[in-house]
A protein has these predicted regions:
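Extracellular/periplasmic carbohydrate-active domains that bind, remodel
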Residues: 1-229
Length: 229
């Protein structure tokens, strides 16, 4: 497997603080991504932010993760992800189709207590933020690890995640694995449903998950849930 197929970045904190130019107004359409760690990845070096990105009419084949957002403490207060839309996407044999990881363990200090602590820390100049994300009209078949894995910072929760008209099913011979590159989670997960932690507003509408082991959704730290079946 190679690296991420498409990676959108805007630099580490020294670059973001100096130039303050986010990656913005990006359109990705009619692309086929295959055999990568992530199909479309935002971050983790995004200290100037990523805003107003739309990905539509794409196909993902045999990647570890499909729509992947990765950040961590230390990226800075200008490291804001906002206005993100993923729509009309088909996936086949993607291990975990949707990932938001606020504890990405990159860089020499990636495994440090500061980066990996799951308890709320003080919000300061180093704290990144994830605002509004929308996943709409997406089908993923032959998944392995998890339907979706969303883990925000406890001190700076993800503001809003919308999932609408989503269909997910698992491979019969699904193999276990780790849904996100972070410490403190099970590395042998298989056929998990939707895992959601530390989100202010989570909107689920017309979500179909077939063949998961356990509950369809596991939640903690969700301030508001709108579930329209």
């Amino acid at each position: 497997m190679g690296d991420d197929c498409i990676a959108v970045k805007s630099g580490k904190i020294s670059v973001g603080a100096k130039y303050k130019v986010p990656s913005s107004n990006i359109r990705i359409r009619q692309c086929c991504m295959r055999d990568g760690h992530g199909s479309i990845t935002l971050g983790s070096e995004m200290a100037a932010g990523i805003k107003n990105l739309q990905a539509r009419q794409c196909v993902f084949l045999n990647t570890d993760r499909g729509l992947r957002i990765k950040t961590r403490r230390g990226r800075g207060k200008d490291a804001v992800i906002d206005g993100i839309l993923f729509e009309d996407i088909r996936m086949d044999s993607v291990l975990t189709p949707f990932v938001i990881n606020s504890f990405y363990f990159c860089d020499p200090d990636g495994h440090s207590e500061y980066v990996q602590c799951k308890e709320p820390l003080a919000v300061d100049e180093r704290t990144p933020q994830i605002k509004e994300l929308c996943f709409r009209n997406i089908q993923a078949k032959n998944c392995h690890v998890a339907a979706a894995f969303f883990y925000g910072l406890p001190e700076q929760k993800i503001e809003r995640v919308e999932m609408k008209h989503i269909q997910i099913s698992y491979a019969e011979d699904a193999a276990s694995g780790q849904p996100a590159m972070m410490d403190g989670i099970d590395q042998n997960i298989c056929k998990m449903g939707i895992f959601a932690r530390n989100i202010k507003t989570l909107v689920l509408e017309d979500i179909q998950v077939a063949g998961q082991e356990g509950e369809v959704i596991s939640m903690d730290g969700i301030d508001s849930l709108e579930w329209r079946k």
